[in-house]
Regions:
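Coupling/switch/interface segments within P-loop NTPase motor domains and analogous charged loops
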Residues: 1-20, 118-121, 126-133, 137-467
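Short, flexible coil/linker segments at or flanking structured domains
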Residues: 9, 29, 67, 115, ...
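Switch/communication elements of ASCE P-loop NTPase nucleotide-binding domains
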Residues: 14, 18-100, 456-520
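Conserved small-residue
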Residues: 29-40, 45-69, 75, 80, ...
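Generic alpha-helical propensity signal that fires on short helical segments
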Residues: 97, 108-109, 192, 237-245, ...
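Generic detector of bulky aromatic hydrophobic side chains
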Residues: 101, 105, 118-129, 135-137, ...
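Short, glycine/acidic-rich hinge or "gate" loops at secondary-structure transitions
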Residues: 106-117, 192-204, 498-507
Length: 520
């Protein structure tokens, strides 16, 4: 009985929950139909002088979603209302506050790479949340922001929002993943104020759509949108990779993902246009750097990776073949992409100096390349090879595993059951390393099966073989949307697990999942 009581008390200390939003008068483009006042995310009293006296969490609440004590604590809140009542608008206010806190904390932080965050103007509201048994408040009044953490009952301690308090605030903070697949959501042009105040707009959305900051800022929105639009083809390709990995991993653990469907056959085919297509997109998405400079660095990294994997790669493909060139290009491109995304790699490559040398002219840049880039490339590759369990380097290790397997088939099929028996993956990362790299186009055939009869791989396989078979693309739009959303969440959660504390980042121990327009 004592151990159970200790578990309950420990759960209270580790618990995280959003308490609510206190709104003041705001521009209509921000508040929309929302009125001023208190919007609790549960049965919580209204704040008085910036403080809420919270009742202790009951055993019923603490145990509601806990199957095992070793699993995370879960708290669920729902926002219910008619169309146009302000449900999404309320979440928008929360996202704006979280974005602005990130902006204030990170703007002055001494990091080689600055996330492309922009301030969301027009907010006059407070966000209350509880973390590790303490009440916290983020106060946002236009450009003025304050942060308070409960020191003891009834007493709130102000913590200045500055880069100096980055670790103190974020080490007990939460990471928010907002999911909304509505075609009309998060269109930045809908966030432009009609009043003369042109500072209120939707430009802030661009900085939080895609995680290219190594999970530095504690907020991301999915799926990725460019100028309010979702690239369906790109989303399909990314979702295909995630769902393939999750479904096979589920099968290996005698579970199904998605529920009631089991992967049967994985097909693959190399994309001989991969290098041309990827290089074009990479240069376009990194337009702040000169294209020729990027190509030169990729070339040097190709040469360096060739010394590591060239002999093995020659056993698979002819040196002059497209296939050989695609594999080396992918490893070099992925390495450079890591260097332009993560601060510690950015520093090793010394991208700023690289830009200076390039701007000085061809002679200066060529001399710098010849003298220093080979040694720098060696350091970068060594760092990559010393980080086999990091989500940052996962795709490079996937490519290394592919080379070491010695499989030179350009297309083919593999039964998922055989894949599982051969590699016996225990984790998502383990499994991904054995799947085909992104320069292959893959597809997976699912079978619909009777879940009650599926207890283990061997006993279920005959059942699966006799079931209806179809590709992921043939699932209903509703099923695909649910799968895409969940695969996004699981992907980010997996990555967050591998984030270690360093000079630039803190690991997040609490996660806030927001499913807007969930009925879609």
């Amino acid at each position: 009985m004592k151990n159970k009581e200790q578990d309950i008390n420990h759960s209270r200390e580790r618990y995280f929950r959003i308490i609510g939003l206190d709104l003041r008068e705001m521009d209509g483009v921000v508040s929309k139909t929302l009125q001023t006042g208190w919007y609790p995310f549960g049965e919580y009293p209204k704040p008085e002088n910036g403080y809420i006296k919270l009742s202790p969490l009951s055993r019923r609440v603490l145990r509601l979603y806990r199957i095992k004590t070793s699993l995370p604590n879960i708290n669920v809140s729902c926002i219910v209302g008619k169309n146009g009542s302000g449900k999404s608008s309320l979440l928008d206010v929360m996202f704006r506050i979280l974005n602005n806190l990130s902006y204030k904390l990170i703007l002055e932080k001494d990091t080689p790479i600055k996330p492309e965050l922009q301030y969301a103007y027009g907010v006059h509201a407070d966000l209350y949340y509880e973390s590790d048994g303490k009440l916290n408040v983020i106060v946002c009044d236009e450009e003025r922001m304050s942060f308070y953490r409960e020191l003891r009952k009834g007493v709130m301690k102000p913590i200045p929002i500055s880069s100096g308090n980055f670790d103190e605030i974020l080490s007990k903070f939460f990471y928010t993943i907002g999911v909304n697949y509505s075609v009309y959501a998060f269109n930045k042009y809908d966030y432009q104020s009609c009043s003369p105040n042109n500072f209120i707009n939707g430009e802030w959305l661009d900085g939080i759509f895609h995680k290219n900051d190594g999970y530095l800022a504690p907020l991301t929105l999915v799926p990725y949108r460019e100028n309010g639009s979702i690239d369906i083809r790109k989303e399909n390709n990314l979702a295909q990779q995630r769902i393939t990995a999750l479904s096979i991993l589920g099968m290996s653990k005698q579970k199904s993902f998605p529920a009631g469907y089991y992967p049967k056959v994985l097909s693959y085919k190399i994309n001989l246009n991969y290098k041309t297509e990827k290089l074009e997109r990479f240069i376009k998405s990194n337009s702040q750097y000169n294209a020729e400079m990027l190509k030169s660095v990729i070339n040097k990294l190709e040469l360096k990776w060739g010394k590591y994997v060239g002999d093995k790669l020659k056993e698979l493909y002819n040196v002059n073949s497209d296939e050989y060139q695609i594999v080396l290009f992918y490893m070099a491109y992925k390495t450079l992409k890591i260097c332009l995304t993560y601060n510690d790699y950015f520093e090793i490559l010394d991208v700023n100096k690289l830009k200076i040398k390039f701007d000085e002219g061809a002679d200066s840049f060529i001399e710098y390349q010849q003298k220093f880039l080979p040694g720098i490339a060696e350091k970068i590759i060594q760092k990559v090879l010393n980080s086999p369990n990091d989500h940052i380097t996962l795709k490079i290790f996937q490519c290394l595993y592919f080379i070491n397997k010695g499989d030179n088939q350009l297309k083919g099929e593999i039964k998922v059951n055989d894949f599982i028996k051969q590699y016996q993956p225990k984790t998502y990362n383990e499994e991904v390393k054995h799947l085909y790299p992104p320069f292959f186009e893959t597809d997976i055939v699912f079978s619909r099966a009777n879940r009650q009869k599926l207890h283990n791989i061997d006993s279920s396989w005959d059942e699966i073989n006799n079931s209806q078979q179809f590709n992921l693309s043939k699932m209903s739009s509703g099923e695909k949307q649910m799968l895409y959303a969940m695969s996004y969440v699981l992907y980010h959660l997996k990555n967050l697990q591998s984030v270690n504390e360093d000079n630039y980042r803190v690991p997040y121990h609490h996660v806030n999942l927001v499913f807007d327009e969930a009925e879609l």
